[in-house]
Structures are given as structure tokens and as C-alpha cells.
Design a protein with these regions (language model features):
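Conserved interaction-surface patches within small, structured recognition/assembly domains
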Residues: 44-61, 70-74
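N-terminal intrinsically disordered, cationic/polar leader segments
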Residues: 1-38, 45-50, 87-119
Length: 119
């Protein structure tokens, strides 16, 4: 398990893996509220009912955190994602590295992921 600085570096590295969303996807409807920086998410189920999400943001830690979370749920069955809760992501240990405002944003991101799966 990574500790402190190594976890932050991991989040920055994950942020660098993010494929930018087109500007047309960076709408207020796709924006995650409650975060210190801007973060957008789009997603839905593919033809096999597997969830696929894409994120983008304007801050490395936020974008990296979102990438870690979406990597976990991408490819999962829609019904599995729909049953998740915010608490299911606690073992990741990311929350402890984030400011309170970023923790709120993480909760909003996970809530949106679940809402998209329930749509």
C-alpha cells in the first residue's frame, strides 16, 4: 500500500493518463459540484450492459482521484455499479489525503457514478 507522498504522486500519475473530454462534454450538467476545482464526468452502459465512464478536470489531484475511481467501475456490470455506496470506496484510503472540499467532491463523484448506472 502506498503512503503519503507516494499516494499523491500516484494520483498525479493517474491524472496524466486521462484522455481529455471534448469541450462539448464540459457542461454544467456533467460537472461535479462540491469540489475545489472543476471536474466533469460522462458515462453510460455499453451494448453488453457494462459501465464506461470518462472524466476530465483542471487539477491533477482531483483528476487523478476521479481516474482511480472510474478505473474501478469501468467495465463493471451496470447492476453492480448501481448497488454501490460511497462507503464502498473507503478502503482506497484516498479520502485521508484530500482537503474537506475535495472529500466532498469525491463523494459527489461517486454519487454521480451510481446515479448514471441507475439511469
Amino acid at each position: 500500500m502506498l503512503e503519503g507522498h507516494d499516494r499523491l504522486q500516484y494520483l498525479v500519475d493517474k491524472a496524466r493518463e486521462v484522455e481529455p473530454l471534448p469541450d462539448t462534454a464540459k457542461t454544467e450538467d456533467n460537472r461535479i459540484r462540491g469540489c475545489a476545482s472543476k471536474l466533469w464526468i460522462i458515462g453510460g452502459a455499453d451494448t453488453e450492459n457494462k459501465m464506461q465512464y470518462q472524466v476530465d478536470g483542471d487539477a491533477f489531484i482531483t483528476k487523478g482521484t476521479a481516474k482511480v475511481v472510474t478505473d474501478i467501475v469501468n467495465g463493471a456490470d451496470k447492476s453492480e455499479v448501481a448497488r454501490l455506496t460511497v462507503e464502498d470506496f473507503t478502503p482506497l484510503g484516498i479520502k485521508e489525503l484530500l482537503t474537506l472540499q475535495r472529500q466532498n467532491g469525491l463523494g459527489e463523484l461517486i454519487t454521480r457514478i451510481i446515479r448514471i448506472a441507475n439511469a
